[in-house]
């Protein structure tokens, strides 16, 4: 990453990806209350989508290689599928 993006763009990626984990932890603790559970999972999904946007920018601007981008994109999509499974099937998580 160039100097001007080293902290800005990487910080956005770091913060949005960590937010996915933090919101997932909160949602799981609130799983007894279906609306809270789904609400927090919706935040997870939004943060995961934001992470994907920053990864797309990183690739398009030439900061990461095609291989790294593809690997991270596939992982991001898998996380999104799992989050959406939880949103659509809350009863399977102790709700």
Predicted regions span which residues?
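Amphipathic alpha-helical assembly/interaction segments
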Residues: 1-95
């Amino acid at each position: 990453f160039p100097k001007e993006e080293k902290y800005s763009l990487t910080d956005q990626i770091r913060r949005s990806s960590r937010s996915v984990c933090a919101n997932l932890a909160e949602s799981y603790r609130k799983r007894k209350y279906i609306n809270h559970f789904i609400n927090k999972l919706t935040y997870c999904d939004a943060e995961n989508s934001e992470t994907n946007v920053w990864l797309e920018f990183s690739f398009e601007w030439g900061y990461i290689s095609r291989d790294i981008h593809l690997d991270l994109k596939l992982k991001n999509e898998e996380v999104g599928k799992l989050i959406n499974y939880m949103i659509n099937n809350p009863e399977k998580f102790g709700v």
